Structures are given as C-alpha cells and as structure tokens.
C-alpha cells in the first residue's frame, strides 16, 4: 500500500523572517486604492480635533482608511469593524496591526462630522482633475430615507396649534376665577395680549405670595375658598408647563409640519417602501444628490418631502462646495417650477428640467384639449385670448400667489363676454356665468424654453442619461450596498454618515470603471501615488458629453 504524503502543517511554527502582511493582498485589490487615496488627501483640518497632551490618539488616516473600506464592503457597524480588525487581513494591513475598539471608531466618526465633508469635496476634485468627471453637468434627484427614530413618535403642527389654542382658552377662563386684582394688573383678561409661560410664572408667584399672607381663619367657607384658590394655582402651574411644552414643540418644528420626538431633525414623510400599503408616514430625510458619470458630486439633506423647494438650495450647496455653479442642470418634473426655471436662467445654468405633463405631451397619441387655456389662441399685442367660438376673452386683472418659499407668482385673469347659450358650453366649462381663465405667462414661457431643450438632440441624450445617473446610484445604494435607512440620530450625524458612504461609493465606482477599462490598470504598488496611477486611465473615460472639449473651444 502506497504511503500517503501531506504538506507540512505546523500552525504554531515561528518564522525567522516574518513576511509582509500585504504579500497576500492582490495588487489590484480595492484596498490598495483606498490606502493610496487617503494617503494623498489633505487632512490638516483633522489636527485641530486632537489635544497635544494626554495619551497618543490613533492616526486619523488609519481610522479614515478602515472606515471607508468598511463602507465599501457594506459594513456600517462599528462593532463589526472592530471584529474585522482582528480577523480580516485587509483591515489588519490598513490599520497597521492597530486594534481600536468600537467605541473609539464611533468617537472618531462623530469627531470628524464637520471635516469629513471637506474630505468628500477633495475626492470629487481629484476625480475631476483626472478626467472621471467634469463638474459642468449635474444630474439631480432625491429619495426619502427613513430615520433611526421610532415610527410612532410624531408631533404634528396642526395638533399642537389646536391644543395650544384650547389651552389658552382654559387659562383665560381660570384666570377669570382667581384673584381679580392680579388678573387686571397683568392684563390677562385682555385677549389681545399673548400669554407666555414667563407671564404665567409671574402670575403664579404673585398668587402664591397673596395666599401665603392670608390670615388664619376658622370659618369653613373661607377655608373652602382658600383651598379652592390653592387648587387653581396648582392647576395654573400645570397649564403653564403644558404651554411651555407646546411652545417648545413649535420651536423645534420651525417651518415644518411634523417631527419625531426621538429624532427632532427628522420629518414624517410617505416612503416608497410601504409594507402595509396604507400610505403610513415615517420619520425620515429627503436626500438630494447630484451625480455625473454615476459619481456622487454633491449631496444635501432636506426636511420637506417635495423636491420643488430643494433645487435652489441644492445649487447653493454646489456653489459653496466648489465655488461655482454647474453649466447644465438635469432633473425630472418634480423640480419644474417657475421659481426654479427663473433661478437657473438668471445664473446661467442650462436647464434640462422637465415640467408636469411633459411625458404626456410626448406620447404619439397625445391630442391637446382644445378647450384648455394653453390651447386657446393668444394675441400678445392686445393681450386677449380667443375662445373656441371666436369670442375675445379680455384681461380683467392679475392674481398673485405666494409659494411656500416666499416666491410671488403672477397669473393674468381673462373673462369671456357671452357664454350664455353657447353650444360648446358643456364641453368648455360647467360653472355659472362667463368663463374665466388664469394664465401664468412667465411660467408658460419657461415651459416653452424647456420643451425646446428637452426635445433637442442634446436634451434627448441628457434625458436618457438621467435615468442611469442618480437612479442607478440610488439602486446601488439601497440594494447592492444595503444602505436603506440612516443609522444615526440628528441631521449632523446623518450627514456625517452619508459623507462616509459617498466617499466609499465614489472610490468603489472608480475601481469598477478602472476594471472595466482594463484589468492591468489596477496595479498599485506601494510607492505609486494615486495621481500617477489614475493618469493611465485618464483620457479613456468619456467625460460628460465632451464638456471639456466644449470648454476648450
């Protein structure tokens, strides 16, 4: 029988010359790119976060590398990162055999919640410098992401305001029943004076002082009256505390209509992920991102669930980050408003932003309604419309409306002359009297300009790209990287967490594009800087629709 032979197996053998730990890491592994990217970032702002005295802290570059690489691998828990620092060779190499515990890792994340945003900006500028992106075009979209707050911790503005009004009425009724002199002195019976907790505290103090100086008596009726007044004072103290609670709710709400008690920065919104199919609202944030070539180039959190009011602040965020505005803005119909169109026109942004019913107009079988105001003939010189029966609809005035952002819109009002007995009245309108239409001429002009851009060759290309730009990023974020819910409480910490995710996402996307261009391009030796190694890829990636060539011309 032949003798079996096995390879030597001595797990506790001592090695005379220990091998380098990164010898077992592939040359094209993304962990090397993370190491090179962070090594070439400017982290001088991190130094102010540490004290010169005390125990030496872990190096911020090491901590940053470990966290970013963990986020690239869908690991967002500090406890899991702590375990990987003892088990995974990639994390051990990045950390240089250091073993920070989960508390230290979490403290570092919270410590750099302001500076990590600057790190994200640096990375985007590196991508722009190496030709991955141009920063001349921004594809904008938003998604609602649930907060860590509990579901049923809501505070509604309407409920608070209604209960506060009821409470004020109870307070006024109670004040009418207590000491009349104090009531008149504090003008509490004057309904024009707004009662405040501090005013009620003064009234309570004066009432207590009066009751303390009441002479002792054996009369039962006087004792009963005294007990009743003390009871009213205690009741007034309870009302004061409740009024203070309502005022605190209104202060936290600000301009919002709701917030969560366990995460005051979160607002209740309707999410796409509705398991009960009942439209239940959940606490969350409206995350707006700007992408180019499927890289995240900007992001911001908003408390309002609609996208219309987020576009202008989001452009301001881009300008603050890069000291410029994008040359082209691409977004869906949720951003198409008069205020947004006007802002982009005044700031030189070429707007490829859809408006309501744009898709309906592009259908082959679409037939415009001949009775709709936009289908009526308009004489711009004499400022009147012509109805389907040929009557002139003369202008009768202007209606002004204020949007939630404070923007004033103007709509011209036109009225027909003789609608009684018109054979088309049943199809035209069903109200009594002569028909009145309201037309926003400025918005219609912006829509015509947007339509011309969107149906052009460049507009069709941007519309096609928009579906695979932010939508693809959201898909990869939620389903491939399992980032479906925020894991922190408070807008500042949520913003910090997503900044780490955005950095990891961009590095991961860069690795994917390098692999797609050629496997040999991802060979990063320890002495090669990220700039040199990216330069080999520069020129092969298609920048955003030849924007760089257009700038050069």
Residue ranges of each PLM-predicted region?
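A ubiquitous short alpha-helical element
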Residues: 3-5, 50-54, 458-461
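Anion-binding and metal-coordination hotspots
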Residues: 8, 67, 74-87, 98-553
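Hydrophobic alpha-helical membrane-insertion signals
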Residues: 1-32
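Basic, short loop/linker segments at the boundary and entry of helix-turn-helix/winged-helix-like folds
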Residues: 26-68, 441
């Amino acid at each position: 029988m032949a003798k079996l032979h096995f390879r030597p197996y001595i797990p506790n053998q001592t090695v005379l010359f220990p091998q380098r730990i990164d010898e077992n890491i592939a040359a094209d592994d993304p962990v090397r790119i993370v190491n090179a990217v962070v090594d070439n970032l400017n982290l001088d702002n991190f130094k102010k976060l540490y004290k010169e005295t005390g125990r030496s802290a872990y190096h911020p570059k090491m901590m940053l590398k470990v966290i970013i690489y963990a986020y690239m691998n869908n690991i967002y828990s500090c406890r899991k990162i702590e375990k990987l620092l003892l088990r995974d060779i990639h994390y051990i190499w990045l950390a240089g055999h250091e073993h920070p515990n989960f508390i230290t890792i979490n403290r570092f994340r919270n410590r750099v919640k302001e500076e990590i945003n600057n790190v994200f900006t640096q990375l985007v500028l590196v991508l722009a410098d190496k030709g991955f992106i141009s920063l001349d075009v921004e594809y904008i979209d938003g998604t609602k992401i649930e907060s860590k707050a509990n579901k049923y911790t809501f505070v509604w503005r309407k409920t608070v305001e209604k209960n506060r009004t009821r409470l004020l009425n109870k307070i006024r009724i109670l004040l009418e029943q207590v000491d009349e002199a104090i009531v008149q002195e504090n003008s509490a019976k004057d309904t024009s004076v707004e009662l405040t907790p501090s005013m009620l505290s003064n009234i309570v103090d004066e009432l207590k002082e009066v009751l303390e100086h009441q002479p002792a008596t054996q009369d039962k009726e006087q004792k009963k009256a005294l007990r009743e007044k003390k009871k009213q004072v205690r009741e007034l103290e309870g009302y004061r505390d409740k009024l203070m609670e309502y005022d605190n709710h209104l202060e936290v709400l600000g301009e919002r209509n709701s917030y969560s008690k366990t995460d005051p920065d979160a607002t209740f919104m309707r999410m796409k992920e509705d398991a009960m199919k009942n439209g239940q609202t959940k606490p969350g944030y409206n995350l707006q991102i700007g992408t180019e070539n499927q890289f995240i180039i900007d992001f911001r959190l908003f408390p309002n669930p609609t996208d219309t009011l987020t576009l202008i602040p989001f452009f301001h965020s881009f300008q603050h980050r890069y000291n410029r505005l994008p040359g082209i803005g691409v977004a869906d119909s949720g951003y198409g408003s008069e205020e947004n169109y006007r802002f982009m026109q005044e700031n030189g942004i070429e707007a490829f932003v859809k408006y309501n019913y744009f898709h309906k107009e592009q259908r082959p079988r679409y037939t415009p309604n001949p009775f709709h105001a936009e289908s009526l003939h308009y004489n711009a010189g004499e400022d009147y419309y012509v109805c389907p029966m040929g009557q002139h609809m003369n202008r009768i005035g202007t209606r002004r409306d204020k949007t939630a952002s404070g923007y004033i819109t103007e709509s011209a009002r036109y009225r027909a002359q003789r609608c009684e007995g018109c054979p088309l009245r049943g199809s035209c309108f069903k109200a009594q009297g002569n028909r009145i239409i309201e037309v926003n001429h400025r918005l219609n002009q912006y829509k015509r300009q947007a339509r011309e851009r969107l149906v052009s060759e460049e507009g069709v290309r941007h519309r096609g790209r928009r579906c695979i730009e932010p939508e693809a990023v959201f898909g990869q974020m939620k389903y491939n990287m399992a980032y479906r819910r925020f894991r922190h409480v408070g807008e500042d910490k949520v913003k910090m967490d997503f900044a780490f995710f955005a950095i990891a996402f961009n590095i991961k996307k860069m690795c994917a594009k390098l692999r797609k261009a050629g496997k040999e391009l991802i060979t990063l030796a320890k002495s090669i800087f990220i700039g040199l190694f990216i330069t080999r890829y520069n020129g092969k990636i298609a920048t955003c629709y030849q924007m760089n060539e257009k700038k050069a011309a």
